[in-house]
Amino acid sequence: MNKDDIIKEFQIHDTDTGSTAVQIALLTARIRHLTEHLKNHPKDFHSRRGLMKMVGRRRKMLKYLMKKDPELYKQLLEKLSLRK
């Protein structure tokens, strides 16, 4: 799935490209891609560190979204097949 498809699926209105939901969805796609890369290259520690930073950033955004809009938070977790 490319970036434009992800943005179209999670945007709130037509010109929305940077809302929290879109950012979380894009980060999730990058995290999944990098996870696959690390399965094939287990000693790539630089990429592993980048992955950890992305996971932390996504966690912070999810925490913010949970406070700001709990309903959207639940929908996003469902669509992205994340925890809880």
UniProtKB/Swiss-Prot annotation:
Belongs to the universal ribosomal protein uS15 family. Keywords: Ribonucleoprotein, Ribosomal protein, RNA-binding, rRNA-binding. One of its GO terms (molecular function) is structural constituent of ribosome. Gene3D superfamilies: 6.10.250.3130, S15/NS1, RNA-binding (1.10.287.10). One of its GO terms (biological process) is translation. This is Small ribosomal subunit protein uS15. It comes from Fervidobacterium nodosum (strain ATCC 35602 / DSM 5306 / Rt17-B1). One of the primary rRNA binding proteins, it binds directly to 16S rRNA where it helps nucleate assembly of the platform of the 30S subunit by binding and bridging several RNA helices of the 16S rRNA. Forms an intersubunit bridge (bridge B4) with the 23S rRNA of the 50S subunit in the ribosome. GO terms for cellular component: cytosolic small ribosomal subunit. It holds the Pfam family Ribosomal_S15. Disulfide bonds: none annotated. InterPro entries: Ribosomal_uS15, Ribosomal_uS15_bac-type, uS15_NS1_RNA-bd_sf. Part of the 30S ribosomal subunit. Forms a bridge to the 50S subunit in the 70S ribosome, contacting the 23S rRNA.
